[in-house]
């Protein structure tokens, strides 16, 4: 495309940057919209807008036209991808929420694996303009009817209950580890622990940007391009069951165990990156990173509902999403800058490993404080009940 239109690669790279920044900017507003009864209508509008925006790429001939279209895609994609998906899963599942979130993320990975070669072949045989039209129309024809006919904001909209809700009712009370705080965004923004949580999630995304530099670091360690590609394929393949494993740990053993498992895998994989000139560490890194990289997609939405509850989830997660988006956008360039300054990735890996420890501490601290707040909330409710009696 850049050769066809005579664009510089740096100029065209701004297209994805603009889309990402628009998504980050819109996240708090989309979160509020997704918490309202008209969420379903908003999702349909965003899905249609996203499909049409992709179609419009086929008519663009100048960089400003691509930039405007990218801004539209970022706007509509924010309301049709991660935020609504996580909100719907939170609304529909009391049990197995982590596993279902993982399945959703695995679905996107498998879809990308299948569609990438198809789209590549279309571009080669029919050209990029035809391909954008085909992608836009295909998404419009398949996804919009599915959203209209199948998706509903809450189980109550279909006269049913969330998965696991009946079991909570039968037991009379939820286990302590499952009790929800259900604090509002307005209230929680006043608490230091919330900003520790925001920083922890931002660091998840910022450190996850190592994935953009791993192939280059493998080649820098003296391996061939084919080896770097094979290693990337290996950890991306392992990430498919890895997401399911991480989701299961969150469901079976709780938020604290999920944080410790995912973050430990990530930390160890980064340590292995320092020693990848030794081939055993190269493959050990790929295996560990296959599990560790899953925190970038699975952890934030699951931990958010686990710490703050489901009542105000959409609003809180929408506000939160702004910060990890910025963190990821900055993480890759900062890691690359460390390489440019030192001529080696090792300093960057040491810094990332240290930051992974910091993010783990922030997330665990936020979780612990939320448990204290739940106990205080229950004591206040008990006192009020006794006073009324």
Outline where the language-model segments fall.
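Structural signature of the two symmetry-related core transmembrane helices
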Residues: 41-55, 257-271
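Intracellular juxtamembrane helix-capping segments at the cytosolic ends
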Residues: 79-93, 295-308
